[in-house]
């Protein structure tokens, strides 16, 4: 909706409606008190900036490898710092809410998420190639819970939710093959969308729309490391609708025989 608001030539009424929608969405995001949503929006904005400024992929790869190396080298110190973090997700203070995302010692929500991730990994080890089948995690993960990972919100029946990760969900339900295919689809989506963005050089309104799609998709697929909602219509419809928009615009652009300098 921010991308639509930035497009030129919109009637005053249309702009007013979009401003109202954006305000509602921003207020909803803030008062959702959902840490994963806050973090994914921030990361998505960074992705948008990297695309906008055409940051070199090799440079990004170098920075990523360097960052991973530094984290590995300082891992013991990082663990000590994390162990001292006692902020809980139940607090209403914004700064403490953010800090609680790194609390892996006492925060029940974080610990339960770790429990679900471990279950997904154990399920993968049981059936590494093809997994347990689509949609089966919720019915199978109970048997793979480690007693040491159980929290106050865990259940012996394993009847409360999913893997809290699209990627680990695919790994446990479809095996290594399924997860690699899912990640390939995600990579293809971003490759196609970013390529489409750079093909539109002069049609600013279209570039703004495509950038909005890039940031929106990035926010979800980053969020997907911590939650999985593609099995619900509320998430699946907008995500795949945006993918369809990218396909449609790409076909339209190719059919017109224009790549750059579109009016």
Give residue spans per PLM region.
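Alpha-helical transmembrane segments of multi-pass inner-membrane proteins
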Residues: 1-54, 58-74, 190-195, 213, ...
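Transmembrane signal-anchor hairpin modules in multi-pass inner-membrane enzymes, especially those
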Residues: 4-16, 57-59, 203-207, 250-263
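Membrane-interfacial loop-to-transmembrane-helix junctions in polytopic alpha-helical membrane proteins
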Residues: 10-16, 29-32, 161-173, 205-209
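A membrane-periplasm/extracellular boundary helix in multi-pass inner-membrane enzymes
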Residues: 31, 52-108, 116-126, 134, ...
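Membrane-interface catalytic loops of GT-C/OST-like multi-pass glycosylation enzymes that act
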Residues: 32-37, 160-165, 226-238
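Transmembrane alpha-helices of multi-pass inner-membrane enzymes
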Residues: 42-45, 59, 63, 185, ...
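Long extracytoplasmic/lumenal interhelical loops at the membrane interface
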Residues: 104-118, 122, 126, 130-174
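Selective detector of the "anchor" transmembrane alpha-helix that sits immediately C-terminal
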Residues: 173-198, 243
